[in-house]
């Protein structure tokens, strides 16, 4: 039985022998990015005892990686709140990626921002723009806004002059959510 020997054939022809090889490296980000998103995704039951279930979808992204860092939300679209909110957004967009949202109730806007992973929501309300209370006394909350944290849903009142520094410190001191 005759068998063909490639090595012997190459020697007889005087050709060099080559061993074919292929190195194909792949460093795709699709799986890694999907894993990153799945790890950050959470559905929380935020219903109070005795109430029907109410789930909140949250994307717990690190603030340095979130597509939107700060959302500016006027409490209402009227009475000068929207204009003041736009002014604040303009101030913040020099340092952060911002979003401005006026559609729906403020609670629904918070939920939408939680879903896309926005770590901070700045709410502009009547205390932000009114220098005096209805009784004529000075308003201590004038030129302040409410900052809401995505992960804990806690809210904190912050002076407009300190807002950029406050958010920068909050980003620097961010602690990831630990889930069981």
Spans of model-derived segments:
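NTP/phosphate- and nucleic-acid-binding module
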Residues: 1-180
């Amino acid at each position: 039985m005759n068998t063909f020997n490639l090595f012997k054939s190459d020697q007889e022809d005087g050709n060099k022998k080559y061993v074919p090889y292929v190195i194909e490296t792949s460093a795709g980000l699709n799986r890694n990015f999907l894993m990153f998103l799945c790890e950050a995704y959470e559905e929380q039951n935020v219903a109070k005892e005795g109430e029907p279930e109410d789930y909140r979808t949250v994307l717990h992204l690190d603030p340095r990686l979130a597509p939107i860092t700060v959302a500016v939300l006027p409490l209402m679209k009227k009475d000068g709140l929207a204009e003041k909110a736009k002014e604040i957004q303009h101030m913040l967009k020099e340092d952060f990626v911002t979003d401005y949202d006026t559609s729906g109730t403020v609670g629904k806007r918070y939920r939408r921002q939680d879903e896309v992973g926005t770590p901070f929501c700045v709410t502009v309300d009547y205390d932000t723009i009114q220098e005096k209370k209805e009784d004529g006394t000075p308003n201590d909350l004038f030129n302040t806004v409410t900052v809401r944290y995505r992960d804990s849903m806690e809210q904190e009142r912050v002076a407009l002059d300190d807002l950029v520094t406050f958010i920068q410190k909050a980003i620097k001191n961010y602690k990831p959510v630990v889930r069981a």
